[in-house]
Amino acid sequence: MAKYQKLVEPFKIGNVELRNRFVMLPMTIEKVDNYHVTDDLVDFYEQRAKGHAGLIEIGSCYVCDCFGTEPKYHTTTGACGCWDDEFIPGFQRIAEVCHKHGSKVAAQLQLCYEWRASGDDPLLSYAPSKDVPSGPFVGMPEREYTKEEIAEVVKQYGQAARRCKDAGI
Protein backbone atom coordinates (compact mmCIF):
# COMPACT_ATOMS: atom_id res chain seq x y z
CA MET A 1 0.00 0.00 0.00
CA ALA A 2 2.96 2.33 0.55
CA LYS A 3 3.25 2.66 -3.23
CA TYR A 4 -0.21 4.26 -3.32
CA GLN A 5 -0.12 6.11 -0.01
CA LYS A 6 -0.69 9.51 -1.67
CA LEU A 7 -4.13 8.32 -2.83
CA VAL A 8 -5.41 8.20 0.73
CA GLU A 9 -3.61 11.23 2.16
CA PRO A 10 -5.40 14.58 2.54
CA PHE A 11 -4.42 17.25 0.01
CA LYS A 12 -5.48 20.73 -1.05
CA ILE A 13 -6.82 22.15 -4.27
CA GLY A 14 -6.54 25.89 -3.77
CA ASN A 15 -8.06 26.55 -0.35
CA VAL A 16 -10.16 23.35 -0.32
CA GLU A 17 -8.77 20.35 1.50
CA LEU A 18 -9.93 16.90 0.41
CA ARG A 19 -9.51 13.89 2.67
CA ASN A 20 -8.08 11.80 -0.19
CA ARG A 21 -7.65 11.78 -3.97
CA PHE A 22 -10.73 9.70 -4.75
CA VAL A 23 -13.20 11.69 -6.84
CA MET A 24 -16.62 10.52 -7.94
CA LEU A 25 -17.06 12.05 -11.37
CA PRO A 26 -20.43 13.56 -12.28
CA MET A 27 -23.12 11.31 -13.63
CA THR A 28 -26.77 11.90 -14.32
CA ILE A 29 -29.14 9.36 -12.83
CA GLU A 30 -32.93 8.99 -12.88
CA LYS A 31 -33.51 10.17 -9.32
CA VAL A 32 -35.00 13.66 -9.72
CA ASP A 33 -38.57 14.91 -9.90
CA ASN A 34 -38.98 17.58 -12.58
CA TYR A 35 -35.39 18.75 -11.93
CA HIS A 36 -35.81 18.70 -8.11
CA VAL A 37 -33.63 16.64 -5.77
CA THR A 38 -35.46 13.64 -4.29
CA ASP A 39 -34.86 11.45 -1.24
CA ASP A 40 -33.48 8.77 -3.58
CA LEU A 41 -30.92 11.19 -5.01
CA VAL A 42 -29.83 12.32 -1.53
CA ASP A 43 -29.47 8.67 -0.52
CA PHE A 44 -27.46 7.91 -3.68
CA TYR A 45 -24.90 10.60 -2.85
CA GLU A 46 -24.84 9.72 0.84
CA GLN A 47 -23.90 6.13 0.02
CA ARG A 48 -20.96 7.39 -2.05
CA ALA A 49 -19.87 9.69 0.77
CA LYS A 50 -19.99 6.75 3.17
CA GLY A 51 -17.56 5.05 0.78
CA HIS A 52 -15.00 7.76 1.65
CA ALA A 53 -14.88 9.66 -1.65
CA GLY A 54 -12.83 12.81 -1.14
CA LEU A 55 -14.91 14.76 -3.66
CA ILE A 56 -18.35 13.98 -5.08
CA GLU A 57 -19.54 15.83 -8.17
CA ILE A 58 -23.29 16.19 -8.76
CA GLY A 59 -23.95 15.55 -12.44
CA SER A 60 -25.88 17.70 -14.90
CA CYS A 61 -27.00 20.77 -12.97
CA TYR A 62 -28.78 22.96 -15.51
CA VAL A 63 -28.03 26.68 -15.20
CA CYS A 64 -31.17 27.71 -17.07
CA ASP A 65 -34.60 26.53 -18.07
CA CYS A 66 -33.98 27.32 -21.71
CA PHE A 67 -37.55 27.65 -22.88
CA GLY A 68 -39.82 27.14 -19.89
CA THR A 69 -41.61 24.29 -21.65
CA GLU A 70 -44.27 22.11 -20.03
CA PRO A 71 -44.08 19.20 -19.96
CA LYS A 72 -40.32 19.05 -19.91
CA TYR A 73 -38.56 17.48 -22.87
CA HIS A 74 -34.85 17.22 -22.51
CA THR A 75 -31.85 15.36 -23.84
CA THR A 76 -30.37 14.59 -20.44
CA THR A 77 -32.99 12.90 -18.33
CA GLY A 78 -32.45 13.05 -14.63
CA ALA A 79 -30.73 16.44 -14.58
CA CYS A 80 -30.99 18.73 -11.56
CA GLY A 81 -32.25 22.27 -11.93
CA CYS A 82 -30.06 25.10 -10.67
CA TRP A 83 -31.64 28.09 -12.43
CA ASP A 84 -33.83 29.21 -9.53
CA ASP A 85 -33.48 29.58 -5.76
CA GLU A 86 -36.23 26.97 -5.33
CA PHE A 87 -33.56 24.30 -6.00
CA ILE A 88 -31.23 25.39 -3.17
CA PRO A 89 -32.88 23.25 -0.43
CA GLY A 90 -32.32 20.07 -2.45
CA PHE A 91 -28.65 20.86 -2.97
CA GLN A 92 -28.37 21.70 0.74
CA ARG A 93 -29.63 18.22 1.58
CA ILE A 94 -26.98 16.61 -0.64
CA ALA A 95 -24.23 18.83 0.79
CA GLU A 96 -25.27 18.06 4.38
CA VAL A 97 -25.22 14.27 4.02
CA CYS A 98 -21.94 14.28 2.10
CA HIS A 99 -20.24 16.66 4.55
CA LYS A 100 -21.50 14.53 7.45
CA HIS A 101 -19.37 11.68 6.07
CA GLY A 102 -16.34 13.87 5.27
CA SER A 103 -16.80 14.31 1.51
CA LYS A 104 -16.67 17.63 -0.31
CA VAL A 105 -19.26 18.31 -3.01
CA ALA A 106 -19.08 20.05 -6.39
CA ALA A 107 -21.69 20.53 -9.10
CA GLN A 108 -21.32 20.00 -12.84
CA LEU A 109 -22.99 23.17 -14.08
CA GLN A 110 -24.10 22.89 -17.66
CA LEU A 111 -26.26 24.52 -20.27
CA CYS A 112 -29.23 22.35 -21.17
CA TYR A 113 -30.08 21.38 -24.69
CA GLU A 114 -33.81 21.64 -24.22
CA TRP A 115 -36.28 22.52 -26.89
CA ARG A 116 -39.97 22.98 -27.52
CA ALA A 117 -41.47 19.69 -28.59
CA SER A 118 -44.67 21.30 -29.88
CA GLY A 119 -43.36 21.84 -33.38
CA ASP A 120 -43.94 25.59 -33.06
CA ASP A 121 -40.22 26.25 -33.04
CA PRO A 122 -37.55 24.66 -35.20
CA LEU A 123 -35.29 22.21 -33.41
CA LEU A 124 -32.12 24.24 -33.23
CA SER A 125 -28.94 23.50 -31.40
CA TYR A 126 -27.18 26.57 -30.06
CA ALA A 127 -23.48 26.90 -30.77
CA PRO A 128 -20.65 29.41 -30.47
CA SER A 129 -20.54 29.51 -34.26
CA LYS A 130 -22.97 28.13 -36.82
CA ASP A 131 -20.04 26.76 -38.82
CA VAL A 132 -18.66 24.59 -36.00
CA PRO A 133 -20.68 21.44 -35.24
CA SER A 134 -20.99 21.32 -31.46
CA GLY A 135 -24.54 20.34 -30.63
CA PRO A 136 -25.75 17.12 -29.07
CA PHE A 137 -27.14 15.75 -32.34
CA VAL A 138 -25.02 15.56 -35.47
CA GLY A 139 -26.82 17.09 -38.40
CA MET A 140 -29.20 19.13 -36.27
CA PRO A 141 -29.33 22.74 -37.52
CA GLU A 142 -27.32 25.09 -35.36
CA ARG A 143 -27.85 28.72 -34.56
CA GLU A 144 -25.09 31.01 -33.47
CA TYR A 145 -25.53 32.73 -30.11
CA THR A 146 -25.95 36.49 -30.20
CA LYS A 147 -23.72 38.63 -27.98
CA GLU A 148 -26.75 39.33 -25.78
CA GLU A 149 -27.45 35.61 -25.40
CA ILE A 150 -23.81 34.92 -24.52
CA ALA A 151 -23.98 37.60 -21.82
CA GLU A 152 -27.18 36.01 -20.49
CA VAL A 153 -25.60 32.54 -20.36
CA VAL A 154 -22.56 33.91 -18.50
CA LYS A 155 -24.94 35.57 -16.02
CA GLN A 156 -26.88 32.30 -15.60
CA TYR A 157 -23.69 30.34 -14.85
CA GLY A 158 -22.75 32.93 -12.21
CA GLN A 159 -26.19 32.78 -10.61
CA ALA A 160 -26.13 28.96 -10.55
CA ALA A 161 -22.66 28.98 -8.98
CA ARG A 162 -23.95 31.35 -6.29
CA ARG A 163 -26.87 29.01 -5.59
CA CYS A 164 -24.48 26.08 -5.20
CA LYS A 165 -22.32 28.10 -2.83
CA ASP A 166 -25.40 29.13 -0.83
CA ALA A 167 -26.35 25.45 -0.59
CA GLY A 168 -22.96 24.51 0.85
CA ILE A 169 -21.53 23.02 -2.31
Predicted regions and their residues:
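Flavin-dependent oxidoreductase catalytic cores
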Residues: 1-169
